């Protein structure tokens, strides 16, 4: 029975050791090969192999995975911050930030084209300003001439209107000279006729006006039959 228990104990103690060594080594080798491929550095995988070899006894002796990961991370950290890798990173950054030749030429052409368009737009704007100023001056001149012509025509029309005989019967006031002449005449019995000429006898339909129909009828009767003295 002791031998049986010894067989099981030996098999149980040996199986985990073999299971722990091979997957860890394969995992580390895969990670280092991927890092070497990314950095494009052929010599990058050499220290990784030594790290794997040095890490295997620690795994077999029962050392924790935390020590190995710290060592690996420390080595990678030192390599990443080394002088050679720092210069390579700066050179790679310069290559990435450097503008391609085609884009640089296109940018220069665009800048030149925009400058030409800006200059052409300024010239066109100046031409439009001069044209607008000239058109405005011509319009003002035509407008002033038209106003003078309208004034002359209105004077002629007013003079002809006031000279017609029935100007006062169609609802307009006669000319000032005729009104003054009639006012100076002292014809007996025509006083109410002159008063009636100053009144508007047309009926008003607006509700805001006062009712003056009675006064209108009185004035009309006085015009027709003046008071006898």
Swiss-Prot record:
Stretches the record annotates as Disordered: 1-70
Q: Which GO terms describe its biological process?
A: intracellular protein transport; synaptic vesicle endocytosis
**A GO cellular component annotation in the UniProt record:** cytosol
Q: Where is the composition biased (Low complexity)?
A: 1-17, 45-58
GO molecular-function terms, A-Z: peptide binding; structural molecule activity
Q: Which domain of life is it from?
A: Eukaryota
| Residues with PTM Phosphothreonine | 187
The way it spans or sits in the membrane comes to:
Peripheral membrane protein
Residues with PTM Phosphoserine: 11, 13, 217
InterPro entries linked: Clathrin_L-chain
Q: Which cysteines are joined by disulfide bonds?
A: 199-209
Q: Where is this region: Involved in binding clathrin heavy chain?
A: 93-155
- Alphabetical UniProt keywords: Acetylation, Calcium, Coated pit, Cytoplasmic vesicle, Disulfide bond, Membrane, Phosphoprotein
| Localization per record | Cytoplasmic vesicle membrane; Membrane, Coated pit
Annotated positions of the N6-acetyllysine modification: 204
Quaternary structure annotation from Swiss-Prot or TrEMBL: Clathrin coats are formed from molecules containing 3 heavy chains and 3 light chains. Interacts (via N-terminus) with HIP1. Interacts with HIP1R.
In the record, the note on similarity to other proteins reads: Belongs to the clathrin light chain family.
Free-text function comment from the UniProt entry: Clathrin is the major protein of the polyhedral coat of coated pits and vesicles.
What is the protein's given name?
Answer: Clathrin light chain B
The beginning of the lineage is: Eukaryota, Metazoa, Chordata, Craniata, Vertebrata
């Amino acid at each position: 029975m002791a031998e049986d228990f010894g067989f099981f104990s030996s098999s149980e103690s040996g199986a985990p050791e073999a299971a722990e060594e091979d997957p860890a080594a394969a995992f580390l080798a895969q990670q280092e090969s991927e890092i070497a491929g990314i950095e494009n550095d052929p010599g990058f995988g050499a220290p990784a192999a030594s790290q794997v070899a040095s890490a295997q006894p620690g795994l077999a002796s029962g050392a924790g995975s935390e020590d190995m990961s710290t060592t690996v991370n420390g080595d990678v950290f030192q390599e990443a911050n080394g002088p050679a890798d720092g210069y390579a990173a700066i050179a790679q950054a310069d290559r990435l930030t450097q503008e391609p030749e085609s884009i640089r030429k296109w940018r220069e052409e665009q800048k030149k084209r925009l400058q030409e368009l800006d200059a052409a737009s300024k010239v066109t704007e100046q031409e439009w300003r001069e044209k607008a100023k000239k058109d405005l001056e011509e319009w003002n001149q035509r407008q002033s001439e038209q106003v003078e012509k309208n004034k002359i025509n209105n004077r002629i029309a007013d003079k002809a209107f006031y000279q017609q005989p029935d100007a006062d019967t169609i609802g307009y006031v006669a000319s000032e000279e005729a009104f003054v002449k009639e006012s100076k005449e002292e014809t007996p019995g025509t006083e109410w006729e002159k008063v009636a000429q100053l009144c508007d006898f047309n009926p008003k339909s607006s509700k805001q006006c006062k009712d003056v129909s009675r006064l209108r009828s009185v004035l009309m009767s006085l015009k027709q039959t003046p008071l006898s003295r």
